[in-house]
Amino acid sequence: MYKDLEKEKYDFLIIGTNLTESALSAYLSKSKYKLIQLDISKSYGGDCKNFNLKDMEKFIEETKEKSTKDCSIKNISLINREVKQDSEPIIEKENFRQYNFDLNPKFVYAKSKSTSELIDSKASNYIEFNSVRKIYFMFNDKFLNVPFSKSEIFISNDLDLLEKQKLLNFIFSVMKLKNNNVDVNSTVDIKKDIELDDDYLFNEMKKNLNIKAMDFLKKNFNEKIIDMILLILANQTMNTKNMTVDQMCDKIYKFLISVQIYDNTPFLVPLYGSSEFTQAMSRLSAVHGSIFLINDLLTCSINYNTDYKKDDQNSGKFVIEINDGERNEKFKINADKIIINNSYLDDKESPIKFNEEIKIKNNSSDYVYKYSAFYSFKNIMELLTYKDGPFYYRVPKNNSILKNEYQLDAIRYFNNTSQVPNNRSLLQISITSDLNEDNKDTFINKAKSISEHFLKIIMDNIKEDILKNYNNKEFKSKCKFNRIRILEEIDRVKEEEEKRKKEEEEKKKKEEEEKRKKEEEEEKKKKEEEEKKKKEEEEEQNKKEEEKKEDKKEEEK
């Protein structure tokens, strides 16, 4: 099977099928480079993998046994929630393949370099998208629907008159500063030639492009608007704490020009999950002649080619010895350059081994922990907002109600993203640690508590929406049952959650009690052994003294 591979010399060996490696593979193969790509895994995707329900449960069991430094898969909590206690298990009742759990969900801007590259490379032929319908951010105990256009800002119930004026003026100032391609025929206000009512903010922005964005915002806005700007418009992460006003404006401009391209929000989400990106690029690479080896039983040894000759077309700078444990076959390939995913370099038990003489340029930076929790709901979400999603939530650190030490992101998926069955919806909560977090267990316990608290807040907000909007005809038409029935269903889910939490606490107490008893028994046993040993030593000592006395008597005699 592998004999033909040994005859060729490859320009590149790419190890890994993560997003970066897949994009490089597609680009290099289109540029006529000969390459071979391998991944020591059961499937494509790296940390962008998707799992169905059964595979997800297997994956969780595997990660319990073996920890990894890959920040995206550090800890995953799979929590299935049934509305009715007498329901059959989800895995038997429904088609488990209709679930797509996305380890590392990714959006793309509707108008950006990423979308242009996907279209130009024709990788978009292999991916289908849906738009994110609403973006919320949590301020105190409320989820605010973030307005982006002039009309949305004016009708927003979440902002007072002064806040509306300031936010609109800020958005217009950013567009005036960054928009070099004015479209007078655009139907979107912010893309036209903008005349500002007040130039003060624009002038301040222009003068202070190199100062920290946070310092600039604190001078001009309240906490609510600052969170809205940084978390939503600028898409802030923990790595953007020191960004300048100029960098912030670039991010916001990128956000704003993508609004109303396909929907009211700028984000597109791939159907079936983020693994579609890597698979589309891998297909594109394969179409242009790349060879792929995806096998979790491969091992590699990489060495310099001592017989390398520059003019020899069949000789590469590196010789890679590969062992296929499944077929029990060994073979060698020649390559001039090697690109490898950092996870293989960071893992001490990596199946990829380098000769000590080879110098490796490792671009890995500080890693973080990421906690993901998945909550699957039956009926409730469907009754309220069927096919209205997906929805995206962002919660800043230290929210007054949630009291979260870490930033929280959440996505609510519906069947229109092909990630859940028709009669279900999926809430995915992701919490990322700070760079200085060095205690994994402490982080996981805190993140778990935060995600459960956030779930309760989501459920309470749904309940409030029902009470507030039920008389609205459009809203009412989405509901299959009456209001009382829906509220009963929500209360039942919350009771289930409380019951589960109580059972977990009791189980934890029981385990701690058993552990304490075991430790006490061990301590008692240890003391008894020590006393026994001490007694034996004393007896031995007494025996020796008696013998000495006897010997002495004998001598005297």
Stretches found by the model and what they are:
Residues 4-20:
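Beta1/beta-strand and adjacent pyrophosphate-binding region of the FAD-binding site
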Residues 13-15, 29-55, 64, 74-75, ...:
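Glycine-rich FAD pyrophosphate-binding loop
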Residues 20, 24, 43:
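Conserved Rossmann-like nucleotide-cofactor binding loop
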Residues 82-246:
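Mobile amphipathic helical/loop "lid" adjacent to a hydrophobic cofactor/ligand pocket
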Residues 102-112, 202-209, 260-287, 293-295:
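Short beta-strand to alpha-helix junction loop
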Residues 267-269, 279-288, 296-448, 453, ...:
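Mid-domain catalytic core of redox enzymes
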Residues 398, 449-497:
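Flavin (FAD/FMN) cofactor-binding core of flavoprotein oxidoreductases
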Residues 498-552:
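Long, low-complexity, compositionally biased polyampholytic IDRs enriched for Lys/Glu and Gln/Arg
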